[in-house]
From Swiss-Prot:
Signal peptide: none annotated. It comes from Pinus thunbergii (Japanese black pine). It comes from the Eukaryota. GO terms for molecular function: structural constituent of ribosome. Keywords: Chloroplast, Plastid, Ribonucleoprotein, Ribosomal protein. This is Small ribosomal subunit protein uS15c. Its main location: plastid. It is found in: Plastid, Chloroplast. InterPro entries: Ribosomal_uS15, Ribosomal_uS15_bac-type, uS15_NS1_RNA-bd_sf. Part of the 30S ribosomal subunit. One of its GO terms (cellular component) is ribonucleoprotein complex. PANTHER family: RIBOSOMAL PROTEIN S15, BACTERIAL AND ORGANELLAR (PTHR23321), SMALL RIBOSOMAL SUBUNIT PROTEIN US15M (PTHR23321:SF26). One of its GO terms (biological process) is translation. Transmembrane segments: none annotated.
Length: 88
């Protein structure tokens, strides 16, 4: 029922477990699991609220990474298969 990302956590070395990329990876994995849960339980409003919190945290990390290092940001977006940030 719950599938993990096609990108394994072995791509993230042990030294970089707290890096922005690894945090975005784990948050994306949680988003996918919660999305599948909410497809089965559409009225679970506390899970919806948790999903919004996770999405906002992931967005903050992606904004930080895009300002800090655009190449790492583009590589991460490509690996995870998620949409990039909207530019103003």
């Amino acid at each position: 029922m719950i599938n993990n990302l096609s990108i394994s956590s072995s791509l993230i070395p042990d030294k970089q477990r707290g890096s922005v990329e690894s945090q975005v990876f784990y948050l994306t994995n949680r988003v996918l699991r919660l999305t599948q849960h909410l497809q089965l339980h559409g009225r679970d409003y506390s899970s919806q609220r948790g999903l919004w919190k996770i999405l906002s945290k992931r967005k903050q990390l992606l904004v930080y990474l895009s300002k800090r290092d655009k190449l790492r940001y583009d590589d991460l977006i490509g690996q995870l298969g998620i949409r990039g940030l909207k530019t103003r």
